[in-house]
Structure formats: structure tokens, C-alpha cells
């Protein structure tokens, strides 16, 4: 029949996956799915949902959005469950804050955890408070907890046993991060009645029941497609092109705003090279130093890496926010989201396909979910200077195809400087899936410390693109507009 056999990953528990590309609204889908699933259950049973996320910042984002009465997620839940919804994080559950046998039976209860709170070797359960005796939850001992569901070597009042007795629906966000043996044990320990996976990159053992195509997202103006990918010869050129392109996009956004459009402040994501074998090449701090050396105001530059989060507490969508440049390695894959991010300027040679997809996904979300008058504001851009361009493209393509995109959703080209001997045909027609001709180029493999700022023509006080950069920017933007029109034509033809 061509249908993939069901994989019984969690014994005797329905376990399905919804594959949704980045920016595809998977959280909103999950909110609707909760109601659909519970509508098939006995109405007298408690409605408990364990919502699992892989990272702490995504946990906070999820809990906040599900709790905020003005957010579409919470508004949908309130509509579906008659405003009887309570969202809990781990600490409020452990303390029994607004959490008791009566409330549990009368409302939709959503427990938001990150994997690390629950994913623990069965021999080390004493290391987690969720597995320990809890006096604040004594009221559940004789009213909710079922004796035959109590985990070995745990007290009946432990939070884990209360959750097990509620036989919850489990939602696993970014479920491709929950494939290890410990992750399977984590799910089994919850005694789920149903497991719903949400991911852009499902693993081979996933039971995919729904697939959202990227073209449908474009038709609804949810994503910035096509992705325009350009490879440069040197890292100075990447920085130069990114800065000038950002300025051009911002000028277009300002003009559109003056004509009644929404306010947009385009942002560049600079992807730094992670340290390799103790070397310190192309690190995030050095990129920031170079941008400041170019006289870019420091308040416009923020770093977001593991261990340093200068974006904490900043609302990037606030029209008074000055941030235009964000430097990262791969921390932005962890649930970070800002529709104003338009340009990914990668100063790293390569990364894994999944990492590329997750980082590239940060520039795909369309601001305000509407089509903008200026064509360039409906596209996203990736600028690189990689000697491994073909390998980098292979990773981008593989990652995005796995995430529901196709080879019609990109345009890729190399910008070749004059001193590099290639033909016009080679320089202008290196499309992502067109031809197999190799172009020999000589890339500068120096780290960011050796970048010559004098070779970067960007002036933050000027209003025009510098002549030196104008050719490259014109090439990028003109081709982007052409590809955008071609993409729109395909959408119309497919309608």
C-alpha cells in the first residue's frame, strides 16, 4: 500500500508525529490537537498535559505564551476549554501552588517541563525533586495516586507518581531531541495516554501522520521564501555585503512604513565559527570588536551564545529597540524567534545539516504574517565565505529538505571577485541544482582577527551603498527580486 508500518515506540501508547517546517505554527497546531484528543476521552477523567521542551529558554517562552491571556495560543485554549485552563512550571507543581486534587479535576492542566527535569537514569532518581517525597502534595496521596502506578523506590506523594496517575497526554516539542534510551524511559515514566511529537526534522522511527508543506506556509505569508544564498571569496566581503544589504532592507522598510505599512527593523545574524581543538578562530567576541571598529554603535550589537545571553529581557519587536546585529554560534537554534531577522551571515565553514536548518530557520519567519509591498522584504538571505561552499550548500539543502522545503525554495550563487579567473557563465549561473561545473576559487582562510576593516566600505552614518559594495549588493538584490517573482509565479500556477 506504500504506507509506513506503525512503530510501537512506547508500548501500548498511541505515539504520532506532526512534521511542520520552522515557522509553521506547530505550537498552535498542538493547542488544537489537545482538544481533539481529549474529546475522544471519557469527559469525567482529569485533563492533564505534560508539555516537554528540550531547552530552558524554550521552556520559558512556551510557559509564558501558554499563560498570556493576550497570546493566540492561550486565546485558542480558552475558547476550546471554556477559559478553564491552568499552566504550571516545575516549581509551582512541587510547591502545590494552585495545584490540588479539586483543581486538577475541574480544568485543563498543562505541565511545562524541560527534558532535563525528567530525563534521568532510573538508578539516580533521588537526584531529582520530582521523584522525591513531597509534603506539599500529600492531598493527592489518597485521592489521585493509584498504588499500582507508583514507581519502584519512590513515595506516593512524589510529583512523578501524581502525573503518572493522571495518565497525561504528552506533547514533545522539538521531538528529534528525544530519541535516546533515557528519553524513551522519560516518556515511559510519565505513563502517557497519548504522545504527540512536534518537529521540523523527525527521526526515522517517527509515526508521521501530518505533513505541512513549506509552499502552504508561503501562500499564507508565514515564511520568507525563497532563500537567497550567496557565497563570497573573503569574510570581509560577507560582512560588507551583510551590512549594506541590511541598510538597504531597512531603508525599504522605512519607506513602506511611511506609506502605511508595518514597522520593520531588519536584523543580521552573524554565525561565528565555534572553537575547534582549542583554537580561537572567528569567535563571537572578535566579530563584535570588528563591528565596533567600524563605528557601529555598541547598543546595536548583541551576543547570544551558550553562557552569554545579551538578548535576555530585550523585546526585539519593540519599535524603540536598537538591535540590528546579533552574533551567535548555534545557540539561536534553541527556540529563539524573531521575524525581523532577515540575513544570516555565516563566518563558519560548516555545521551539521540539522544545525544549519535550525539556525537558518531563524531568518525564515515572515514579519506580521502578511505580504509586504517591497519584494525584498518577503525574502531571506544567507551570505557565506566558505571554501567548502558545496558542502555547506549540501548541508543547507539536506536540512531544509528534511524540514519540508524543496529545491525550488532556494537560489544559490557565488560572487567571484575580479582577480579570480572564472567565466561570466560560471559566475552568474551557479544555481543550486543546475549544472555540475566546478569553479576554482581561492578563499581566505584567515580568522576574524586578520580581517582588514579598511576593506569594508560600510559607513554606519551614510545613507547610500558604497561604490565598492554596490556591484555585489546590486547582484544580490536584482537576482533576489527575479527569484522572488519566479517563486510567486510558481505559487500562482500551483494554486
Identify the role of each PLM range.
Residues 326-343, 361-363:
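SF2 helicase motor core recognition
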Residues 22:
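The conserved Walker
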Residues 39-40, 60-64, 70-90, 97-100, ...:
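Helicase-associated low-complexity regulatory tails and linkers flanking the ATPase motor
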Residues 19, 33-60:
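Conserved SF1/SF2 helicase motif Ia
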Residues 173-174:
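Walker B catalytic acidic pair
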Residues 1-19:
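Conserved pre-motif I regulatory segment
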Residues 26-27:
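Conserved lysine of the Walker
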Amino acid at each position: 500500500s506504500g504506507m509506513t508500518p506503525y512503530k510501537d515506540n512506547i508500548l501500548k501508547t498511541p505515539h504520532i508525529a506532526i512534521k511542520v517546517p520552522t515557522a509553521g505554527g506547530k505550537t498552535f497546531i498542538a493547542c488544537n490537537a489537545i482538544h481533539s484528543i481529549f474529546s475522544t476521552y471519557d469527559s469525567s477523567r482529569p485533563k492533564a498535559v505534560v508539555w516537554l521542551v528540550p531547552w530552558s529558554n524554550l521552556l520559558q517562552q512556551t510557559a509564558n505564551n501558554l499563560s498570556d491571556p493576550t497570546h493566540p495560543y492561550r486565546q485558542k485554549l480558552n475558547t476550546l476549554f471554556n477559559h478553564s485552563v491552568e499552566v504550571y512550571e516545575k516549581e509551582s507543581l512541587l510547591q502545590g501552588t494552585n495545584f490540588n486534587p479539586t483543581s486538577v479535576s475541574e480544568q485543563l492542566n498543562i505541565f511545562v517541563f524541560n527534558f532535563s527535569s525528567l530525563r534521568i537514569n532510573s538508578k539516580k532518581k533521588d537526584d531529582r525533586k520530582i521523584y522525591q517525597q513531597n509534603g506539599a502534595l500529600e492531598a493527592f496521596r489518597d485521592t489521585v495516586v493509584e498504588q499500582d502506578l507508583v514507581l519502584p523506590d519512590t513515595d506516593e506523594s512524589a510529583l512523578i507518581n501524581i502525573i503518572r496517575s493522571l495518565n497525561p497526554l504528552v506533547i514533545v516539542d522539538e521531538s528529534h531531541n528525544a530519541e535516546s534510551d533515557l528519553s524513551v524511559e522519560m516518556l515511559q515514566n510519565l505513563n502517557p495516554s497519548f504522545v504527540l511529537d512536534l518537529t521540523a526534522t523527525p527521526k526515522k522511527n517517527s509515526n508521521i501522520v501530518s505533513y505541512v508543506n513549506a509552499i502552504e506556509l508561503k501562500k499564507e505569508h508565514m515564511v520568507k521564501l525563497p532563500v537567497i544564498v550567496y557565497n563570497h571569496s573573503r569574510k570581509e566581503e560577507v560582512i560588507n555585503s551583510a551590512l549594506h544589504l541590511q541598510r538597504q532592507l531597512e531603508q525599504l522598510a522605512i519607506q513602506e512604513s511611511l506609506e502605511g505599512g508595518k514597522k520593520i527593523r531588519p536584523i543580521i545574524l552573524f554565525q561565528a565559527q565555534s572553537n575547534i581543538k582549542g583554537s580561537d578562530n572567528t569567535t563571537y567576541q572578535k566579530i563584535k570588536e570588528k563591528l565596533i571598529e567600524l563605528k557601529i554603535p555598541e547598543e546595536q550589537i548583541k551576543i547570544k551564545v551558550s553562557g552569554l545571553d545579551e538578548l535576555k529581557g530585550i523585546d526585539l519587536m519593540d519599535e524603540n529597540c536598537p538591535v540590528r546585529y546579533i552574533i551567535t554560534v548555534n545557540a539561536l537554534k534553541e527556540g529563539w524567534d524573531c521575524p525581523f531577522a532577515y540575513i544570516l551571515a555565516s563566518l563558519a565553514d560548516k555545521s551539521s545539516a540539522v544545525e544549519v536548518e535550525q539556525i537558518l530557520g531563524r531568518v525564515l519567519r515572515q514579519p506580521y504574517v502578511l505580504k509586504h509591498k517591497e519584494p525584498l522584504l518577503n525574502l531571506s538571505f544567507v551570505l557565506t565565505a566558505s571554501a567548502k561552499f558545496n558542502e555547506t550548500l549540501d548541508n543547507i539543502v539536506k536540512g531544509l529538505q528534511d524540514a519540508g522545503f524543496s529545491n525550488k525554495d532556494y537560489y544559490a550563487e557565488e560572487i567571484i571577485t575580479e582577480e579570480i579567473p572564472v567565466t561570466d557563465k560560471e559566475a552568474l549561473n551557479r544555481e543550486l541544482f543546475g549544472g555540475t561545473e566546478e569553479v576554482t576559487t581561492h578563499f581566505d582562510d584567515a580568522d576574524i582577527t586578520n580581517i582588514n576593516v579598511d576593506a569594508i566600505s560600510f559607513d554606519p552614518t551614510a545613507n547610500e551603498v558604497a561604490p565598492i559594495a554596490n556591484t555585489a549588493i546590486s547582484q544580490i538584490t536584482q537576482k533576489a527580486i527575479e527569484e522572488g517573482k519566479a517563486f510567486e509565479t510558481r505559487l500562482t500556477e500551483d494554486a
